[in-house]
Amino acid sequence: MDPNESPPNQFRHVVAMPYPGRGHINPMMNLCKRLVRRYPNLHVTFVVTEEWLGFIGPDPKPDRIHFSTLPNLIPSELVRAKDFIGFIDAVYTRLEEPFEKLLDSLNSPPPSVIFADTYVIWAVRVGRKRNIPVVSLWTMSATILSFFLHSDLLISHGHALFEPSEEEVVDYVPGLSPTKLRDLPPIFDGYSDRVFKTAKLCFDELPGARSLLFTTAYELEHKAIDAFTSKLDIPVYAIGPLIPFEELSVQNDNKEPNYIQWLEEQPEGSVLYISQGSFLSVSEAQMEEIVKGLRESGVRFLWVARGGELKLKEALEGSLGVVVSWCDQLRVLCHKAVGGFWTHCGFNSTLEGIYSGVPMLAFPLFWDQILNAKMIVEDWRVGMRIERTKKNELLIGREEIKEVVKRFMDRESEEGKEMRRRACDLSEISRGAVAKSGSSNVNIDEFVRHITNTN
């Protein structure tokens, strides 16, 4: 379909239902923004809880994206990490009925398709009852989804339970390059087992979706994406990176924020940007080691700390860095002063790091982040790990952190030069995917054709 043409009636009104979390809402919004910019007569109803509307309502967006809200029937975003299983259960059981009522109230025009996060377990069921096609958006890597869907292979190979330090290699999962057990989330063990059992219920609903969208670019994970053609009977499309790259070119007439002004004063490639994400956090003891190791490294840094900003500022007073509570991450990563990205390896951040051409220092915390770190370091070869030198250590010590930060930010070493060359190459691939005739735009048009022809 020519994007300049008006979309058919089957694709006039999209209802978007993201899973209520920052790492899920952002890519869903980026998808909707790309579509309304590409298809002039498309309208989107973007559904969030009342709490989330307070968080994102003021953010700029196209006029043809409108918010609708569900009541706050789930735990607050501010406390969901304290009982993650309870939060998932609340999303599964408390939001379906109010979403149905909202859906039935939308009639000008009536919804033509539902975009739902894969983790919104009831979306396919709701769409089926109303004969509205549902498109599933997977916001993590295609590789981790292939791992999840082939989890039975771990059991048959005797790898269901393992120690995080195990070196044994898994080489039998479609779409997954040979990977050590320690680089896989322990999905059958303890707390992770409980999380996986709840997630698996959502994966069982995938065959009922009209299609599956990935936030990645095909070129970044082609083996994993190709593996889905034999695993699923629905079409899959890689339409990423679903990051806000289009907004980088928007001119801002307001005064530049202080952190950008500070970056302008730093030498090229000298700043380590640090973000540990917006959901999980490390222990106080580990944070103390990070702070002291960073200070002793003598490296310039910009640290975004969502919560605990004042405490960090005090601990790092007199160092070569700046601590802020929020920043425009993609803009920071694309700034010439930034030479490295300390990341928790959430997939959105990983995609932004790749797009920016900045090497990544991987410090994963949980779940898909563990495998993302392996992909960054071993598959794409655009980063290093922060890890224990001794397997029995509970904490990564300040000395280890100091040394790896210095090594990572050394632009003159052969290792540093090769890592940065690879990061630049991967950036070109990522940017090429979203260029005018790139794979992601081609896939978006194919996806729209599929939806309109089968509706």
From Swiss-Prot:
Keywords noted in UniProt: Acetylation, Glycosyltransferase, Transferase
GO biological process: regulation of flower development
EC numbers on record: 2.4.1.-
Sites of N-acetylmethionine modification: 1
GO cellular component, one term: cytoplasm
Entry-linked CDD domains: GT1_Gtf-like
Enzyme class: transferase
UniProt cross-references to InterPro entries, sorted A to Z: UDP_glucos_trans
Annotated disulfide bonds: none
Any GO molecular function: UDP-glycosyltransferase activity
Residues that coordinate or bind UDP-alpha-D-glucose: 278, 327-329, 344-352, 366-369
Family: Belongs to the UDP-glycosyltransferase family.
Protein name: UDP-glycosyltransferase 87A2
Organism: Arabidopsis thaliana
